[in-house]
């Protein structure tokens, strides 16, 4: 955990200078740390100043294409027996083949009359 330093400003500067001197001595034996730093600064220049942060824009989200239509189920209506549009193969509307759930017209009329009583 970080704690504030116990040394004063002069002691902190001295420790920092020694750390720079010793890190230079760790890879170079020229013995002139300051001259070496000046040479590097002349050749490399000053480090660039940090750029101010640019405005952060949300990424552009492109729309996805629509999903393809589901495969056609030509026999979707119960009792049509074929083409839901009712062409020749499917018969005319109301003239079902008597399949599941389809009642004859007479049965419907009888059910309505029975419900009315």
Curated annotation (Swiss-Prot):
Q: Where is this region: Disordered?
A: 43-104
Gly residues compositional bias: what residue ranges?
Answer: 79-98
Q: Which InterPro entries match?
A: HEV_TT_vir_Orf2/Gyrovir_Vp2_N
Q: What is this protein called?
A: ORF2 protein
Which lineage?
Viruses, Viruses incertae sedis, Anelloviridae, Alphatorquevirus, Alphatorquevirus homin3
């Amino acid at each position: 955990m970080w704690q504030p330093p116990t040394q004063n400003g002069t002691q902190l500067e001295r420790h920092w200078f020694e750390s720079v001197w010793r890190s230079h001595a760790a890879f170079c034996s020229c013995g002139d740390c300051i001259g070496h730093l000046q040479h590097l600064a002349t050749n490399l220049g000053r480090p660039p100043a940090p750029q101010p942060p640019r405005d952060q824009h949300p990424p552009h989200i492109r729309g996805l294409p629509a999903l393809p239509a589901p495969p056609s189920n030509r026999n979707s209506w119960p009792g049509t027996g074929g083409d839901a549009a009712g062409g020749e193969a499917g018969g005319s509307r109301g003239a079902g083949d008597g399949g599941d759930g389809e009642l004859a017209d007479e049965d419907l009329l009888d059910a309505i009359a029975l419900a009315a009583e």
